[in-house]
Regions:
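Conserved beta/loop motifs at nucleotide-recognition and modification sites
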Residues: 1-208
Length: 208
């Protein structure tokens, strides 16, 4: 059977995930990964806003940075009761989940997160979970796993048009398609190119 390439894989329905977050509210555990890091950060911001409507503070927000993850520090962050807000939020960045020592200890922690806490594992665009590992299997059974993929061409075209409009420019369809052909289909790569084109375009309309 032929292996699917990145363009053939199922695309994440980002608007649907935002609606789900709004309707269901924050879950206890999230695993965010995938190549589309711009959308990942946008989703993280929305999730954090739902958990901490008044913003980050030292009582209800904790951030742990990888590649190592100290179990006691993790437990302490999760067990800290939120202050002046309903939920606490623990952001864990770029931990080597595929290489954690004594993974069973972390499996126990991630499987027993209190109702008032949301833990979010945020992985780099290069991360790929090893589905053979017990820790990854456990995470997938208890976490809301979101893989942020490149978006469909139609969605990207609409997004490019909106980005140019925000900069006071309109853009021809052919110009938007050419931009994607040259810069690729990752939003983080398209944004600086859109900004440069909008800044140097002489007229109000960007053409191919």
């Amino acid at each position: 059977m032929a292996r699917k390439n990145s363009r053939d894989e199922e695309k994440m329905n980002y608007p649907a995930e935002l609606r789900r977050l709004k309707e269901e509210g924050p879950q206890r555990l999230y695993l965010l990964w995938g190549p589309e890091d711009y959308l990942r950060e946008q989703y993280l911001a929305q999730l954090k806003k739902r958990c901490l409507p008044e913003g980050e503070d030292s009582f209800s927000y904790k951030r742990l940075d990888g590649p190592e993850l100290d179990r006691q520090e993790l437990v302490g962050a999760i067990d800290a009761v939120p202050f002046m807000t309903e939920r606490s939020f623990v952001e864990i960045r770029d931990v080597e989940l595929n290489r954690l020592k004594e993974p069973e200890k972390y499996m126990a922690v991630f499987s027993d997160i209190p109702e008032y806490c949301t833990v979010c594992l945020v992985q780099s665009a290069q991360f790929e979970p090893d589905g053979r590992l017990k820790l990854i299997k456990t995470l997938r059974s208890v976490a809301r796993e979101l893989k942020f993929t490149q978006q469909s061409q139609g969605m990207l075209i609409d997004w490019i048009i909106r980005r140019f409009a925000a900069a006071g420019k309109s853009v021809e369809l052919e110009a938007a398609q050419r931009l994607m052909f040259i810069s690729g289909d990752l939003m983080s790569r398209l944004i600086p190119e859109i900004e440069k084109i909008a800044a140097f375009a002489k007229g109000e309309r960007v053409t191919a």
